[in-house]
UniProtKB/Swiss-Prot annotation:
<dbReference type="Pfam" id="PF24986">
    <property type="entry name" value="PRC_RimM"/>
</dbReference>
<dbReference type="InterPro" id="IPR056792">
    <property type="entry name" value="PRC_RimM"/>
</dbReference>
<dbReference type="GO" id="GO:0005840">
    <property type="term" value="C:ribosome"/>
</dbReference>
<comment type="similarity">
    <text>Belongs to the RimM family.</text>
</comment>
<comment type="subunit">
    <text>Binds ribosomal protein uS19.</text>
</comment>
<dbReference type="GO" id="GO:0042274">
    <property type="term" value="P:ribosomal small subunit biogenesis"/>
</dbReference>
<dbReference type="InterPro" id="IPR009000">
    <property type="entry name" value="Transl_B-barrel_sf"/>
</dbReference>
<dbReference type="InterPro" id="IPR011033">
    <property type="entry name" value="PRC_barrel-like_sf"/>
</dbReference>
<dbReference type="GO" id="GO:0006364">
    <property type="term" value="P:rRNA processing"/>
</dbReference>
<dbReference type="InterPro" id="IPR036976">
    <property type="entry name" value="RimM_N_sf"/>
</dbReference>
<dbReference type="InterPro" id="IPR011961">
    <property type="entry name" value="RimM"/>
</dbReference>
<dbReference type="GO" id="GO:0005737">
    <property type="term" value="C:cytoplasm"/>
</dbReference>
<comment type="function">
    <text>An accessory protein needed during the final step in the assembly of 30S ribosomal subunit, possibly for assembly of the head region. Essential for efficient processing of 16S rRNA. May be needed both before and after RbfA during the maturation of 16S rRNA. It has affinity for free ribosomal 30S subunits but not for 70S ribosomes.</text>
</comment>
<keyword id="KW-0690">Ribosome biogenesis</keyword>
<dbReference type="Pfam" id="PF01782">
    <property type="entry name" value="RimM"/>
</dbReference>
<feature type="domain" description="PRC barrel">
    <location>
        <begin position="99"/>
        <end position="174"/>
    </location>
</feature>
<protein>
    <recommendedName>
        <fullName>Ribosome maturation factor RimM</fullName>
    </recommendedName>
</protein>
Length: 176
């Protein structure tokens, strides 16, 4: 459904009387994309057809965002899009400007190593959002997952060229 498209976040309840919707993400690359922009909108409901929609405005609001789309002018019209997931074409992603920046999608597949460069035989398979901090999900085998808080105390250097992620002192917290 979304080959070549990046999931941005989920639409929340209508906001105000002019058809705006809440956009449930903490930080959005959409603030760096030239508007208006054509996005895909999908839902997990198989009866909901994937739709293209034009984003006209995005504004910060209470630590999140609100968005306005072409053709949606009332709360009633906005209501049918609640729960929809927005997708942006990959080719519109803003360029990475520093070596410390990355897109979360680029981390999937990294191999875990310890501080000494020894492979832990863990592969990063997912990153879960969490109110306190993201959680890195590593797979050691088909049945075993290891969850690690994405914090400097546990995670060292990310090397996208070598496809590695350094985990700090895994022997101390792996037993928990």
């Amino acid at each position: 459904m979304t080959e070549g498209w990046i999931s941005l976040g989920q639409l929340g309840k209508p906001f105000g009387i002019k058809g705006w919707l809440r956009f449930n993400v903490r930080d959005s690359i959409l603030t760096k994309v030239k508007l208006p922009v054509r996005l895909k909108l999908g839902k997990s409901d198989p009866n909901f057809p994937e739709t293209e929609i034009i984003l006209l405005e995005i504004r910060p609001h209470n630590g999140k965002f609100v968005v306005r789309f072409e053709g949606i002018a009332t709360p009633e019209e906005a209501e049918k899009w609640v729960g929809g997931i927005l997708f942006l074409p990959q080719n519109l992603l803003p360029k990475i400007e520093t070596k410390d920046e990355f897109y979360v999608r680029d981390l999937i597949g990294l191999q875990a190593i310890d501080e000494f460069g020894k492979s832990l035989n863990w592969k990063l398979t997912d990153i879960q959002d969490n109110p306190a901090h993201p959680i890195l999900v590593f797979s050691k085998s088909e049945e075993e997952e290891i969850l690690i808080p994405f914090l400097h105390v546990f995670v060292g250097e990310l090397n996208l060229e070598k496809k590695t992620i350094v985990l700090i002192q895994p022997e101390l917290w792996n037993e928990v």
